[in-house]
Amino acid sequence: MFHRRFMVDMNMYKKMHPAQNENALEKASHNRGKHSHVDSSIGEIDVDMTQDDPPSDDEFLMCLPSTVKGFDMKNKEWRLLEVAFIQRVEWNDKAFEDLVIEPRTKSLIKAVVTNRVRSEEGADVIEGKGNGLFILLHGGPGTGKTLTAESVAEIAKRPLYKVTCGDLGTKAHDVEKYLETVSLLGKTWGCVVLLDEADVFLEQRSLANLERNALVSVFLRVLEYYDGILILTTNRVGTFDEAFKSRIQLNLRYTNLDRDQRLQIWTNFVKRLEEMEVSSQQISGSYGINAAEIRASLSALAGENLNGREIRNILSTARQLSSYEEKPLG
């Protein structure tokens, strides 16, 4: 079953929606006026009471109303959630294990991320300055950059906040406002922030494009004071802006996949399809998978010059065709 991830933080919701909070307070005050004989403190819990003996998850959920606001980490919007269906996130450590990149690169990423999570202290001790971990992943499409960022969030056991340039807008003022919100949420919730396709922020500034220069300056200013984990990905890097070089702790280039890597990706996807099939056997519309037949073709398939995204899309299309024709995938 697919589980979407939400951050339940009523304090942050109230900060971001002050008008709604004021309306709720006015309504509560009006109701108390109608029932003045009722002690307004009834139902309130002193925070200190829960420090020494924190309630279990089930006990805590019983104290909540039937619905609460939660921030959808995928769509980046607040949604009304039914408390009865809320459960803790199950982190997928296997995602990083299955990541198909150079072993040394994988070890390096895991080392710096693990050390960052273990320690909240950074090398820059200037008051007010950020002590963030900034990682740049650059290379062609479908080479594993975005998947690396998603896997890092899993091993760090932190929510992933994914931002694309389309989210940011094109005006410096809008970009700054959006990035400040991302920075606030990222710091408060301990997120791994992914800025996907960050080309516009990384290339060297020039006199020929003042509008883009303003965007780069805004990004650098926000970056200066961010103290979380930030991963930037780009398909191309021409000339780095000099201001970024001292801020990026880990700069990794992703090359096109070789045959062995493509074979491993095919193998991982087939294994995942088998696992999905086991969990969905009771679901109508599932017609099975002929894994042995597919595996017999993997060597030939790995010889095709495809990237990871193309391999995923091929298998996704094959599953849809299998369902449409009502026969096993293979």
Feature map (PLM): residue ranges:
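Conserved AAA+ ATPase small/helical "lid" subdomain
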Residues: 252, 273-330
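Intrinsically disordered, low-complexity sequence elements enriched in Ser/Thr/Gly/Pro
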Residues: 2-3, 30, 234, 260, ...
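Walker A/P-loop NTP-binding motif of AAA+ ATPase domains
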Residues: 95, 99-295
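AAA+ P-loop ATPase mechanoenzymes
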Residues: 1-122, 132, 169, 242
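Generic detector of ordered secondary-structure context
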Residues: 65, 100-104, 211, 310, ...
